[in-house]
Structure formats: C-alpha cells, structure tokens
Amino acid sequence: VYNDKLYGLQIWHNSPEYVMVYNKTLFEENGWEIPSTYAELKDLCAKIAEQGITPWFMPGADGWQHQLAFFQIGGVYEEATPGLYDALNTNQATFADNEKMLEVLNEFKELSDAGYFGEDWIGTDSTNLTNEFGDRNIAMAMANSSYIQQIKDDTGTEDEFGMFLIPLGDNTWYPTNPAGPTMFGYKGTEHEDLVKEFFNFVTTTESLQEILDNSPAYTNVDMNDDAIEQHWLPEEEEFLATVDDSKKSVSVLQTGTKYTNDYWMQFGQDMVAFCQGEMEANDV
C-alpha cells in the first residue's frame, strides 16, 4: 500500500533469513561460545576444526548461497558509511574501494584459505546439508530459521540448534528483508472487482491460517491480524530476543540497493575467483 492505494499483496513471513544456524548441543558439550566479532569467529573455527568437524559449511557449488555471507550484513556497510545505500542507488558510490566491504571479502577468503568452509567447499552443494548437521559433521551453516525443524525431521537428531548473526566485519545487524512473493492485479483487467474480492478472500483470518498451517517453511505470517495462531519456533524467539530493534532498521544489501540482485550470480563467481587467487578483492 502506498498513498492509500493497493499496488500489490504480499503474504510472507517475518522469520530470520540466512543467519548462522549452529548445533547448540555440540557447542555446549565443547564449551564453545557464540562469536560476536570476526576475531571470535576465526578463533572458534580453529577450535572446531581441531575436532575434525567442518566449522562453517559453505555450499559453493549451489552457486548462489555463499554470496549471502556478504549481502546479508548490509547494515554493517551502511553503519560504516552512513548514506551508502542512497549513494549506491544514485551511482555516487561503488562497492570498489569500500573499506568495510573489502574487509569482509578478505575475512571470507581468510576462512576459505584456512579450510574452515570445508574441503572443496567450492565444489560442494547443499543437497546433504541436513544430514551433515544431523551426523555432526558440521557445526554451523547459513540457513533460514525454519531449517532447524527440517534438520530434526530429516535426521531424527536429538541435538538442539540455535542462531546468531553473521559476524563478518564485526556485524551486529539483523538481516531485515521486507521483500517476498507478491500478487498483483492487472491494471487493464475487465474484472477489477474479482481481483479485489480474491485479495479480500486470501487475507481473511481463515485463509491466512490455512496458508500458514500448510506451509512447512513458514512458522508465521507477517500480517496485521492478531487472530492468526502463529507457530514461532522457540529457537526463533530466543534468537530474536537477542537483537535490538535498532539493529533491524537497515535492509539487506540485495533489497536496499537497486542492482545487486541482477549481478548475484556474477558476484558469486567473482568471490570464488578471489578465493582461488584469480582476482583481487577490489575487482569482485
């Protein structure tokens, strides 16, 4: 809705998207602490690797996931350079020569060089990710919060899991992403009343509850309807309680900037080339 006019209808959730999911039980058994800075993350990865466990599973062969480590922490870039998003969107700034972005890319490569993403992470996909978690072969991975339930359902593990923010660049920002699948009515339709009626139908409490109850990937729907029975996971509520609302005010990079999504795959290829020593960070 903009200026009291309906342009599209978005039915989506408000769950944490692509944060760090970790094996909480494994952490507790080994006395590992959740890292809040890059230095702490690197030290943690070293301790995990000593146990023969992949610290941070990175499915490079998927081609689209490893970029999230860079894009999901948009708030840390905006914090370092206030007004960056506006400058990027008006072609007054670029990723190149941005100190914080270069810092994050170099940290990513440092972890890659150390083997903390797993052996041949560039050639590994996420097909077996739930089993990797269930078998305790890995300790952490970027995933949506609902993935925790999928791990338990797929593997039967009794381990508990939790979430924390991606700490590259000493990030403390939540990956706010106010974008999702949206339904639109055709402006030139001869059946405008039917479009409106359909929108009214799918936004009734009963319809929204039906959508939520039959969508395994959803634990909630982000709608202005207090009558909906949400299914928040305890892990989600625990994680969200650790994030201050002031740290939710900046969108992820791919939503806050106009062109990032268009170059998503190319950026991912460049990240791989950088990690392989075929490209400089400033050229990514």
Describe each region flagged by the PLM.
Residues V1, Y77-E103, D153-G156, L165-T176, ...:
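Short, solvent-exposed loop/beta-turn-alpha elements that line the ligand-binding surface or hinge
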Residues V1-V19, E33, K42, I48, ...:
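Hinge/lid segment of periplasmic solute-binding proteins
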Residues Y2-I34, G60-N89, N177-Y186, D262-V272:
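Periplasmic solute-binding protein
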Residues L26-F27, A46-Q51, T127-N137, A141, ...:
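Short helices/loops that flank or line small-molecule/ion binding pockets
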Residues E29-N30, A114, D153-A217, V252, ...:
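Extracytoplasmic/periplasmic substrate-recognition and gating elements
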Residues Y38-D43, D120-G134:
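Short helix-initiation/N-cap motifs at beta->coil->alpha
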Residues C45-K47, T90-W121:
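Glycine-centered hinge/linker elements that transmit conformational signals in sensory
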Residues T176-N177, T219-M223, E237-V284:
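C-terminal capping/gating helix-and-loop segments adjacent to ligand/active sites or protein-protein/ligand interfaces
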